[in-house]
Amino acid sequence: MNIWQRSARRADKRRRKQETGMTWINRGRAFAGCVALAGALAAAPAGADTGKVGLDLPLLTSPFWQSYNRYLLHYAKDMQIDALAPVNSNGDPAQQITDMNTLLNLGAKGIVVGPLDSAAIGRALDAAAARNVPVVAVDVAPTQGKVAMVVRADNRAYGEKACQYLGEHVRRGKVVQIMGDLASVNGRDRSEAFRACMKGYPNLQVLEIPAAWKGDVAATALDSLLSANPDVKGIYLQAGGVYLSPTLQTLRRKQMLYPAGDAKHVAIVSNDGIPQEYEAIRRGDIDATVSQPADLYARYGLFYIKAALAGRTFKPGPTDHGSVIVQRAPGVLEDQLPAPLVTKANVDDKGLWGNTIK
């Protein structure tokens, strides 16, 4: 039995509650739903779901996106989707537009993309729409252009969960949020939600580092900030995949890295749910992370593109896989997948994708 089969079997047996009270996605049901959909599509008229699907990755320097890529390839095969080789836009919004056009020229009849820039991606979406090629956006919602579905988690909840954890565990002093790219709706949502939530903790002072999802930028800025503010008590990393390693290296170099429980410990909450974050939680280097569902991003990105190619449409409301579809804007639907807070108390949960991918 391979890792994917073991993961699916374990997930089939687990129905857990998130700390927010939201029901965890029953991965077994979700998988069954994908299989059922695949069967339904197979019975559709000839040509209804035929054609190659293009896969555009925003970057591959982050362990999160590396994991997402592996899940994409697995589920594309499992769902019998004829996928073109994934293209890596390498963190460059302009390159992503070029890559999307390349996929169209290669004959893609549908595209799954992780947008880098919420506005800039609109040009590529318009090009796809001109050829009647449906697009599913994963992780980042576009602010312009047409998509069949947006698949992401509630990114405002990421910022709120990080704020609440730090607010409850730091109590007083300075906290830093290392922000993502504010050209991305994800960066804006997390930053704004963290900032707004922190107003409820008047004894905490928020310092900010705009790092645009770049680890080297985060490291340099954090080094300078800590030199001027050696009394920082907490840090929020908006993307553990790119910020975790440089943050820990900077704290270690400044002799500020102490394990959780030590009076000198700097509390850290991250986002992503990658295996490296879980190991850092177990060591006591960081305290928590919000697990972005890389597995479900891939699964449902492909689910919705196959549905779009078969002519299926959806409406706002609860889904059969534990999430909620909301209307972001007129004609733009978003399937908001749950993302649990992971701490030392539940870091070994085998239902978390970061504990199953190898």
Language model features with spans:
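Hydrophobic alpha-helical
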Residues: 101, 109, 113-129, 194, ...
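Short beta-strand elements in bilobed, periplasmic/extracellular small-molecule ligand-binding domains
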Residues: 78-89, 177, 198-215
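Hinge/cleft segment of the Venus flytrap/periplasmic-binding protein
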Residues: 197-198, 300, 304-358
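Flexible loop/hinge segments that line or gate small-molecule binding clefts
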Residues: 118-157, 165, 171-174, 274-280, ...
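Extracytoplasmic "Venus flytrap"
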Residues: 52-71, 75-79, 84-99, 108, ...
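Hydrophobic alpha-helical segments within soluble ligand-binding/sensing domains
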Residues: 96, 151-175, 188-189, 217-219, ...
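Bacterial N-terminal signal peptides that target proteins for export
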Residues: 17-33
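Short, solvent-exposed amphipathic alpha-helices that sit
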Residues: 64-79, 158-162, 185-204, 221, ...
